Amino acid sequence: MEFMKQLEVWFLVGSQHLYSATTLKQVADHAHTMTSQLNEGAGLPIKIVLKPTGTTLDEISSVARDANHSEQCVGLMVWMHTFSPAKMWIPALSQLQKPLLQFHTQFNRDLPWSEIDMDFMNLNQTAHGGREFGFMGARLRLPRTVVVGHWQDEEAWSKIGNWMRIAAAIHDSRHLKIARFGDNMRNVAVTEGDKIEAQIQFGYQVNYHPVGDLVKIIDAVPAADIEALLAEYEQSYTLTEAVQAGGPLRASLYEAARQELGMKKFLTEGGFGAFTTTFEDLHGLHQLPGLACQRLMQQGFGFGAEGDWKTAALLRTIKVMGTGLAGGTSFMEDYTYHLEAGNNLVLGSHMLEVCPSIAADKPVLDAQHLGIGKKADPARLLFAAPAGKAVNASLIDMGNRFRLVVNQLEVVDLPEAMPKLPVASALWKPLPSLQTSAEAWILAGAAHHSVFTQSVDIEQLRTFADIMGIEFVVIDEHTRIPALKETLRWNEVYYKICH
């Protein structure tokens, strides 16, 4: 995501004036060294910006206020090098509106056994300074992330990097505009939702845009731009004979390229990060956008079919969260089952719109018949997802809260080819089993649409939900239905009392 290059995480080190000027200079020097080395060698996705050491209530509060108003700052990382009395932090933490990470580390990795003295003990007080700060976070009921470990350890780098991605995703969601081309699929329940509450909770700006407005832009795309995009297709994919130059369905591919360019222009110029379509509202379009949606997802846009704006928003968020990580993320639907005894599997797919970021091999580009939508044969990319770990995530509106349901998956290779299936797909074993997973998913009310990701894990999504203040339900190898039912009941009580 290009916009992440402009973002910052501010680093505030806590101390106090109880210490000598010499000690405070050492604190500042250590913080500067850490910042430089983390920026240069830790592979972090966002630049760390060191702020002056916080030694008074006013200094600390000023940084928090500035962080709130900064469009570049997506989060605040704090470290208690020495002891920093937490009452000095109350105003700052009370007003902070950005994600908070406490880095519980110390400058030295090892104790200098033969040299250690009280000067060393006086300077390196993370062990108890961090606990003082932790109390105030708990007292204020703050959602926060704690990373424990030496600042030169790769595990700590990974955790900080993932938190940065989450902070960037939250920053993005606060500004996220979602274009709904057409309304929701008629009579479908789960794709509905409270758009006002979504804007209050997440920042999502969800608005309807007539398909006719999009058609005007699509129809005005220059022929030269379409030809250039067709050349890109030919370089990127294996084209079937039907859509190659001179093929009987080449016109369908030409129209798909026109759609992609027009849709991207509409979304980019309007500042949209996500969009939805619906096959029930295609007036003026020659085909249901398939290839266009696939490629726009790969370029970072969130997408939801049939007007599913919550999944479109979540897809965009997880795309941002997965920046720089291996694996892709796509719109997905649990489509059909393989119920062989001892080998239960789910075939995930959709009519057309599966993101090629999850493709195991070079996709095949084809155009085939699609009865739904009653338009011309649409172009689409065909591929299968690679074997490995994955997660399905579904965001639903429970009326008094949003609930994020996630399921751990094991993607498997196709046991046989599916030459007659004209859509992209992923085949997986849901954990702990199909029986328990499906029952739990249904009991939790999770949608038939989901975000399928092989780049973002459950813990990242848990942190996102914690910061956002939404309910989080996990289905994994440890899930048992009686315990899940109890969790859902207790969650109901908690959200009625506390929210």
From Swiss-Prot:
GO biological process, one term: L-arabinose catabolic process to xylulose 5-phosphate
EC category: isomerase
PANTHER family on file: L-ARABINOSE ISOMERASE
Name of the protein in question: L-arabinose isomerase
Cofactor(s) the protein requires to work: Mn(2+)
InterPro entries, per database record: Ara_Isoase_C, AraA_central, AraA_N, AraA_N_sf, Fuc/Ara_isomerase_C, Fucose_isomerase_N/cen_sf, Lara_isomerase
Highest classification ranks of the organism: Bacteria, Pseudomonadati, Pseudomonadota, Gammaproteobacteria, Aeromonadales
Pathway(s) where this gene product acts: Carbohydrate degradation; L-arabinose degradation via L-ribulose; D-xylulose 5-phosphate from L-arabinose (bacterial route): step 1/3
Family to which the UniProt record says this protein belongs: Belongs to the arabinose isomerase family.
Binding site for Mn(2+): 306, 333, 350, 449
Gene name of this polypeptide: araA
Pfam families per UniProt: AraA_central (PF24856), AraA_N (PF02610), Arabinose_Iso_C (PF11762)
